[in-house]
Amino acid sequence: MVSARTPRQGAPALPDSLKLTIEYLPIATLGAGGRKLRLHKKQDIAALAKAIELFGFVVPLLIDQDNKIISGNGRLEAARQLGITDVPCIRLTHLDATKLRVFRIAENQLGQLAGWDNEALGLELQDLSKIDLSFSLDVTGFSAARIDSFILEGDGGGENADVLPDRPTSPVSRLGDLWHLGDHRLCCADATAPESFDVLLKGEQVRTVFTDPPYNVAVDGHITGSGQHGEFVMASGEMTDDEFTAFSIKAMARAADHLVPGGLLYWCMDWRHTLNTLSAASATAMEMVNLCVWDKTAGGMGSFYRSRHELVFVFRKPGGTHLNRVELGKHGRNRSNVWAYEGVNGFGAKKAKAREMHPTVKPMALVRDALLDSSARGDIVLDLFSGSGTTIIAAEQSYRQARATELDPRYVDVGVIRWQDYTGREAILAATGQTFREVREQRRMEVASPPPVSAPQLTVVSTTDVLPAPRVRVRARPLAA
């Protein structure tokens, strides 16, 4: 083990020949020093220029006695692009020509020997992400996608993110309620109605939509066993095929209304309704990008070819290119169109509770990774059918801003409570500024103590004056022989 040395008393001072002085020199007086050892791409110079604009030219160029650059060619080119005329320089006069050549290599290589502590870096970036910065963290030189990866590594990937609260029998939320969940919003509203999004979005545009609409399949006996779960309030097997297609068109049109050109729509669906989904996409002019398959790793109900997958259709709104945060693994994220995430099929108390709370609940990591693929930190993401609030939790963890609608007040409550449990913060009712707890107490009081109702004035009359005498109809029955 190497221990730190303390300076000896009477240790010699640094020789004057090794003391460094910063001088400012015109760019025009500086020249290249030997072979160019590092290759700078255009985006590298752009990143350096962005850093200089924000932090200033705080790292001087290193030059020899003839104004030849030893280190800092990239910074010099960035300064030229910014129109800077004079730059800070340190002249290395104590090294001979041979040592300068060796130093040029060492100075560029030694800094790369140490690796990053990814967990510590992730925590630092996570802390910075919580601050309302006036600039992007990609000024650090890391891409936005890499920053997302570091942050997720720093926080452990979302412990307890899939924990679901109990579904209430008497919901607090009511149709029309808009809840503010920190940076997110959840509205108890119909996802097919245009006016729902006037309240929810207030003119905002959406980068990505991830939604898991009802499949128009009866829950009882198909998705879960008999009696485990109530039916959805809409599209739970009661619609004809044409009606379900019309329903899908309306919902998909709302997504298309608010997506930015090039924004992606992730539309979860089962294999039975592939044609309905494609018909809705055609009717709303959405372009198909890919078809992803969620591999649940275990089969569900059924006796013939038990299903262990669900489909996630990926559509794009025309008029722009979609945001690609994968780029064939360039940023450390390797993705294909087969997504293997453990589902709630199989055994175990935790999975049984998840099935009981919501029959088609998606793993938070599945939704989060889709948001990481197609959006940036701070972007607005939309879920038309919020259900248990998984998209809201995924947005919370990935530093996106979720906007969600859910028609069933019970599931609105689940989404609110789940977010509160996960973050430790309180949801606020937009209309009154009250917390969820305060609204719950107030509405319980209203139910427990309804306003008095005046008794109606009754007039007693003789039934013989009003009602005719009953007519008795006698049917003759044949006598037994």
Regions found by a protein language model. Name each.
Residues 16-412, 481:
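Core catalytic lobe of class I
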Residues 5-8, 440, 471-477:
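Basic polycationic patches enriched in arginine
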